[in-house]
């Protein structure tokens, strides 16, 4: 099937155009995301709509149709830049909130575009059908000329981001610092604006004005979950954008639905634009779920693992407190009736499977119906007791907490005491022997 699909030159032009456009939008979408204005692409895409219509009308009635793409791109970019100027004016002069300014430009320019589209529909139905693709996208109509334009814009974007990378990064992250360094921030902001407008205008026929902003946001959002380094985010974002464009284009051609009209099954081609956006959204969703650093699933697993480890350590401390009271052989009844078990687990029954895990790890040894701590388990329990009492001492002596309120806090943070932190606390507290409740703090050799 792949060979049949890619042997079609018409599809190949559309495939390359959509893929390159999605990669370019992902690159500049990363810049918008880092500069905390991801919704700017939404406003600029809607602002370009009347410009696209004016360009199409100019090409239809004033100039030759062969030059239509030039005038459409020119007037579309002009309208987009003009819309950005109004956003800046409303924010700086009228003191309007930025989100309000974005919404104002979006609805006003889009309304003007709808009015122009109504005029075109009455005066030239053929032209209306052609320009209607700008609103919802029609990737199947993209030919060699559009693919060439997409390649030029992509290569120009790569060159601009490579040549002015440091300047754009500094301007994006800290504009005041960039001004202090003597950088011409207005120049680099204008450069970014021109490229973003150019990408929007050259890409609206692929996914449409309504959906193109998703291709600015989704790939960069997914890439941001995987790295903190901007250069890596740019590469991953472009990769995700390219994968989304390629998959969406291929699925729209390779898989068709069949609608029953009357008594006949009519093939229905899936729209490319929405499929591209769905693929980008799925990739971003997977990154949000499974990102090694901040993915929801990974964080959920970490929380569950920490909660499980904390309960296991509490069980170990229960064993130690009972054995510390001269009861070496511990029955199930002694265990669940101890005050420490009641403090940690309340009325819960004896956690046999958890104790079996402690036994498997070599912390506890079972002899007939009794349990006893091993040397390894006693050492680990003393480490936890030392951590708890060190934290209590630090909270009382260094942070002026009352000794009545530090027990619960120490119960939470005793599980995160590393060797380095133990050494630091020991130095700060001058290696104390007793905690605020006059209980002995085990030494570093795990001895009391």
Curated annotation (Swiss-Prot):
<dbReference type="GO" id="GO:0010043">
    <property type="term" value="P:response to zinc ion"/>
</dbReference>
<keyword id="KW-0472">Membrane</keyword>
<feature type="transmembrane region" description="Helical">
    <location>
        <begin position="47"/>
        <end position="67"/>
    </location>
</feature>
<comment type="similarity">
    <text>Belongs to the ABC-3 integral membrane protein family.</text>
</comment>
<dbReference type="InterPro" id="IPR036421">
    <property type="entry name" value="Fe_dep_repressor_sf"/>
</dbReference>
<dbReference type="InterPro" id="IPR022689">
    <property type="entry name" value="Iron_dep_repressor"/>
</dbReference>
<dbReference type="InterPro" id="IPR001626">
    <property type="entry name" value="ABC_TroCD"/>
</dbReference>
<dbReference type="GO" id="GO:0043190">
    <property type="term" value="C:ATP-binding cassette (ABC) transporter complex"/>
</dbReference>
<dbReference type="GO" id="GO:0046983">
    <property type="term" value="F:protein dimerization activity"/>
</dbReference>
<feature type="transmembrane region" description="Helical">
    <location>
        <begin position="193"/>
        <end position="213"/>
    </location>
</feature>
<keyword id="KW-1003">Cell membrane</keyword>
<dbReference type="InterPro" id="IPR036388">
    <property type="entry name" value="WH-like_DNA-bd_sf"/>
</dbReference>
<dbReference type="GO" id="GO:0046914">
    <property type="term" value="F:transition metal ion binding"/>
</dbReference>
<keyword id="KW-1133">Transmembrane helix</keyword>
<dbReference type="Pfam" id="PF00950">
    <property type="entry name" value="ABC-3"/>
</dbReference>
<keyword id="KW-0813">Transport</keyword>
<dbReference type="GO" id="GO:0003700">
    <property type="term" value="F:DNA-binding transcription factor activity"/>
</dbReference>
<dbReference type="InterPro" id="IPR001367">
    <property type="entry name" value="Fe_dep_repressor"/>
</dbReference>
<dbReference type="GO" id="GO:0055085">
    <property type="term" value="P:transmembrane transport"/>
</dbReference>
<feature type="transmembrane region" description="Helical">
    <location>
        <begin position="270"/>
        <end position="290"/>
    </location>
</feature>
<feature type="transmembrane region" description="Helical">
    <location>
        <begin position="100"/>
        <end position="120"/>
    </location>
</feature>
<comment type="function">
    <text>Part of an ATP-driven transport system CPn_0346/CPn_0347/CPn_0348/CPn_0349 for a metal.</text>
</comment>
<keyword id="KW-0812">Transmembrane</keyword>
<feature type="transmembrane region" description="Helical">
    <location>
        <begin position="233"/>
        <end position="253"/>
    </location>
</feature>
<feature type="transmembrane region" description="Helical">
    <location>
        <begin position="144"/>
        <end position="164"/>
    </location>
</feature>
<dbReference type="InterPro" id="IPR037294">
    <property type="entry name" value="ABC_BtuC-like"/>
</dbReference>
<keyword id="KW-0997">Cell inner membrane</keyword>
<protein>
    <recommendedName>
        <fullName>Probable metal transport system membrane protein CPn_0347/CP_0413/CPj0347/CpB0354</fullName>
    </recommendedName>
</protein>
<dbReference type="Pfam" id="PF02742">
    <property type="entry name" value="Fe_dep_repr_C"/>
</dbReference>
<feature type="transmembrane region" description="Helical">
    <location>
        <begin position="69"/>
        <end position="89"/>
    </location>
</feature>
<feature type="transmembrane region" description="Helical">
    <location>
        <begin position="15"/>
        <end position="35"/>
    </location>
</feature>
